[in-house]
Amino acid sequence: MTINLSTTALIDKIAQDLGFTEISNLTDSILIKNKELISIATFLKNTPKFDFQMLVSITAVDYIEYFEIVYHLLSIQHNQRAILKLRCYDRESPSVPSVVTIWPGAELQEREIWDLKGIQFTQHHNMKRILLWEDFKGHPLRKDYLR
């Protein structure tokens, strides 16, 4: 059985090694700032203590006031899981950094989130629709989507 990594230990190590202190502990996950995503993701993948080589999934939740992007990470080496979350408060043109350069498996998942929720992943090399046709208007899984 895979063990959920202690969020407190994870936050402490990130704060110690990267100096990021504005990280919130959400019981089973950590909430990070958008601008810190790439640094933290790279750190979690490349630090032997964590070794999160696998991005299991990315999803997005529309809470109306903000979008929450959720990253599920897995370390096969340590048999541990971790969940990163970040929030995007811009409904007009939401965007977050792409993690494709860190975890190539993020490519299709980021495109799906763009297609259905309208969240742009900056620095993504192929940000186009994946499920709907290019001329489709809007993003149908947004709570403010109207036909």
Outline where the language-model segments fall.
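Terminal low-complexity/charged segments
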Residues: M1-R147
